[in-house]
């Protein structure tokens, strides 16, 4: 049984929540333009681009996107963008005032990356009969791909922060020190473990669609 079934959350409610998050991202974009704050503008704009992916994948590639998956992706980018805005009228963002906000968004973002890795490796496994990927291998693969992406992201944060300091502009991404980086990676692993353990519940349809597309391409 899925979490939404236990909580009694309908698909309509999930779709509305995802839509409200998109509206919220538009609002954050205008807040960033009004302040003006480059970090808010960039993070809100990237978030708006990402939340279009589920409908794009479903419309152009026939990959079924459950409302829960769409809400999952929307939540990750929405909370990240919201963290750069904070409470209206305040000088400080949630990333600066709430110590756990950065770790929450890292776990959510990592779970989305892990889901993409899980769906891909399971689709390859189902597509080719000559390939057999044991569950343990899939689990480890998802962990490794997520950790690798997490390390890349931390390096990117550091590079952008240093470049912004050199040119004297506002940093789009902020790094808060080595200890924070290590904790971020720990929460990345938490997100990956959740997906690697329970990914079958939510990603079966996506895996099936990807495997079908791989088979269709191989037959051409």
Positions of the model-derived regions?
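Cytoplasmic-side transmembrane-helix entry/capping segments in multi-pass membrane proteins
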Residues: 42-45, 64-76
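Transmembrane alpha-helix boundary signature
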Residues: 60, 82-93, 104, 120, ...
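Internal alpha-helical transmembrane segments of multi-pass membrane proteins
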Residues: 127-147
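Haloarchaeal acidic low-complexity proteome signature biased toward cell-envelope/secretome components but also
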Residues: 1-27, 60-65, 130-133, 201-220
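Alpha-helical transmembrane segments of multi-pass membrane proteins
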Residues: 76-81, 114-118, 145-157
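Interfacial helix-loop-helix junctions of multi-pass membrane proteins
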Residues: 86-95, 147-189, 193, 197
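Short, hydrophobic transmembrane alpha-helix segments
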Residues: 28-41, 55-62
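Membrane-interface loop-to-helix entry segments
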Residues: 99-119, 182-190
């Amino acid at each position: 049984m899925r979490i939404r079934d236990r909580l009694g959350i309908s698909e309509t409610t999930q779709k509305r929540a995802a839509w409200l998050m998109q509206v919220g991202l538009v609002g954050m974009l205008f807040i960033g333009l009004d302040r003006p704050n480059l970090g808010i503008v960039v993070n809100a704009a990237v978030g708006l681009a990402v939340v279009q992916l589920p409908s794009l994948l479903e419309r152009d590639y026939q990959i079924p996107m459950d409302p829960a998956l769409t809400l999952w992706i929307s939540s990750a980018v929405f909370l990240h963008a919201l963290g750069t805005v904070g409470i209206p009228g305040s000088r400080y963002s949630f990333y600066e005032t709430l110590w756990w906000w950065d770790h929450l968004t890292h776990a959510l973002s990592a779970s989305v990356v892990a889901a993409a890795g899980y769906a891909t490796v399971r689709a390859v496994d189902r597509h080719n009969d000559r390939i057999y990927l044991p569950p343990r291998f899939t689990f480890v693969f998802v962990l490794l791909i997520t950790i690798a992406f997490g390390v890349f992201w931390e390096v990117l944060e550091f590079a952008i922060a240093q470049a912004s300091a050199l040119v004297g502009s506002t940093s789009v991404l902020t790094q808060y020190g080595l200890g924070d980086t290590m904790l971020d990676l720990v929460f990345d692993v938490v997100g990956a473990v959740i997906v690697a353990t329970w990914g079958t519940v939510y990603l079966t349809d996506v895996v099936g669609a990807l495997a079908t597309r791989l088979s269709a391409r191989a037959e051409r």
